[in-house]
Amino acid sequence: MLHLYNSLTRKKEPFVSLKPGTIGMYVCGITVYDHCHLGHARSMVAFDVMVRYLRSQGFDVTYVRNITDIDDKIIARASERGVSIDELTAQYIDAMNNDTHALNILPPDHEPRATGHIETIIRLIQRLLEKGNAYVSENGDVCYEVDTFPEYGKLSHKDIEGLVSGSRVEIVKEKRSPLDFVLWKKAKPGEPSWPSPWGEGRPGWHIECSAMAMHELGEQFDIHGGGLDLQFPHHENEIAQSEAATGKPFANYWLHVGMLQVNGEKMAKSIGNFYTIADVLKEHHPEVIRYFLLSSHYRSPLNYSEENLLNAKKALIRLYQAVKDVPPQTEDSKLDEYWQVQFNQAMNDDFNTPVALSVLFQLAHEVNKSNSPALAHTLKNLAGILGFLQKDPESFLQSGLAEEEKLVIEQLIAERLQARAERNWAKADQIRADLLSKGIELEDGATGTTWRRIAE
């Protein structure tokens, strides 16, 4: 049975969906004012694998990942660039789609944008005003009054005083309490705005997600996810406003992905230590990046380094080598039940991908020993749930080399062929040894000599 670590209760719990066989999942997406960095990729890959696995187990999953396309940062960046907000957000949405496609991240079933749900947001704010959980401040903003929700802090597990002193709470004199947060911002000159019962303005960040999640999944759903940095204040505020409005639990399970770190610090645009997905893709194969992001449990911190990416590359080469020369699978062959069970046990333990990967390597070892099509097929199928090992092995094993390098290898193979024709075995063996020392293995067959990279 699937067990998930629920941030709300701080323990692993058996997963029971609201409606048997179906799952509603909402994950906070990106704010589109810049290129996605690897921290974003980690979260997106983690939830992508969760969705893939849940579907492989027969669940009908509705996966929602939003786009924040109106925000202070977006407005500021558009102003800096001298472009419209629509131009800016379109540019970075396209860039995000390119990144996710390269990393084999499946598109969500629904990808709502904040600007497309203004009326839904306004209606939710009206409910909160009617129930006495919100107020119109002196400056015209509509704010949520945290003191009206006694359970505030139940997700981050901090007391109210701790939240005030230990968080990035904006102190605004118009608020009744420092923890109160804006639901609707009164329009400022030159900023985008929409009409509302409280005048021209735009929605606050937190209310956008509550409104979009409930619009797509209903007032209650199964799983809400995002990066650990969103737990407070964003997710805490989502719970407060949503549950105050409906009187029901918002999401049953809260899942948070640990931070991607560089030298022990969170990778973040605000710190300036981030690596964009696009830049890393220039240096590393997409599957290598994906493997690296899954090499640590999703809740644990993960350190970015070239060494860790190199280790991911070597690991993938070993897996591709295992399936490279296996005879084709017959149509009536089934997956090996033993290895399926081992893999599922790992994934049922809160999506434990490091253990699942170890199962794949044990299986690859058996494939190497037996050359069994059934085991190789099982290996590819299980790895496919993690989103890799689906490329042509030859293509992957020769990837990452510049065309000039490939030409040099082919030239050396031709020289070796000539040396063998001349019975110059010493030269032929030396060429093979030189290439092997550079991680290139030659294979002589009936149709000629082929080459591939190997894990050094």
From Swiss-Prot:
<dbReference type="GO" id="GO:0005829">
    <property type="term" value="C:cytosol"/>
</dbReference>
<keyword id="KW-0436">Ligase</keyword>
<dbReference type="InterPro" id="IPR015803">
    <property type="entry name" value="Cys-tRNA-ligase"/>
</dbReference>
<keyword id="KW-0067">ATP-binding</keyword>
<dbReference type="InterPro" id="IPR056411">
    <property type="entry name" value="CysS_C"/>
</dbReference>
<feature type="short sequence motif" description="'KMSKS' region">
    <location>
        <begin position="266"/>
        <end position="270"/>
    </location>
</feature>
<keyword id="KW-0648">Protein biosynthesis</keyword>
<dbReference type="InterPro" id="IPR032678">
    <property type="entry name" value="tRNA-synt_1_cat_dom"/>
</dbReference>
<dbReference type="GO" id="GO:0004817">
    <property type="term" value="F:cysteine-tRNA ligase activity"/>
</dbReference>
<dbReference type="InterPro" id="IPR014729">
    <property type="entry name" value="Rossmann-like_a/b/a_fold"/>
</dbReference>
<dbReference type="GO" id="GO:0008270">
    <property type="term" value="F:zinc ion binding"/>
</dbReference>
<comment type="similarity">
    <text>Belongs to the class-I aminoacyl-tRNA synthetase family.</text>
</comment>
<feature type="binding site">
    <location>
        <position position="209"/>
    </location>
    <ligand>
        <name>Zn(2+)</name>
    </ligand>
</feature>
<keyword id="KW-0030">Aminoacyl-tRNA synthetase</keyword>
<dbReference type="Pfam" id="PF01406">
    <property type="entry name" value="tRNA-synt_1e"/>
</dbReference>
<dbReference type="InterPro" id="IPR009080">
    <property type="entry name" value="tRNAsynth_Ia_anticodon-bd"/>
</dbReference>
<feature type="short sequence motif" description="'HIGH' region">
    <location>
        <begin position="30"/>
        <end position="40"/>
    </location>
</feature>
<comment type="subunit">
    <text>Monomer.</text>
</comment>
<feature type="binding site">
    <location>
        <position position="28"/>
    </location>
    <ligand>
        <name>Zn(2+)</name>
    </ligand>
</feature>
<feature type="binding site">
    <location>
        <position position="269"/>
    </location>
    <ligand>
        <name>ATP</name>
    </ligand>
</feature>
<dbReference type="Pfam" id="PF23493">
    <property type="entry name" value="CysS_C"/>
</dbReference>
<dbReference type="GO" id="GO:0006423">
    <property type="term" value="P:cysteinyl-tRNA aminoacylation"/>
</dbReference>
<protein>
    <recommendedName>
        <fullName>Cysteine--tRNA ligase</fullName>
        <ecNumber>6.1.1.16</ecNumber>
    </recommendedName>
</protein>
<feature type="binding site">
    <location>
        <position position="238"/>
    </location>
    <ligand>
        <name>Zn(2+)</name>
    </ligand>
</feature>
<keyword id="KW-0547">Nucleotide-binding</keyword>
<dbReference type="GO" id="GO:0005524">
    <property type="term" value="F:ATP binding"/>
</dbReference>
<dbReference type="InterPro" id="IPR024909">
    <property type="entry name" value="Cys-tRNA/MSH_ligase"/>
</dbReference>
<keyword id="KW-0963">Cytoplasm</keyword>
<dbReference type="InterPro" id="IPR015273">
    <property type="entry name" value="Cys-tRNA-synt_Ia_DALR"/>
</dbReference>
<dbReference type="Pfam" id="PF09190">
    <property type="entry name" value="DALR_2"/>
</dbReference>
<keyword id="KW-0862">Zinc</keyword>
<feature type="binding site">
    <location>
        <position position="234"/>
    </location>
    <ligand>
        <name>Zn(2+)</name>
    </ligand>
</feature>
<keyword id="KW-0479">Metal-binding</keyword>
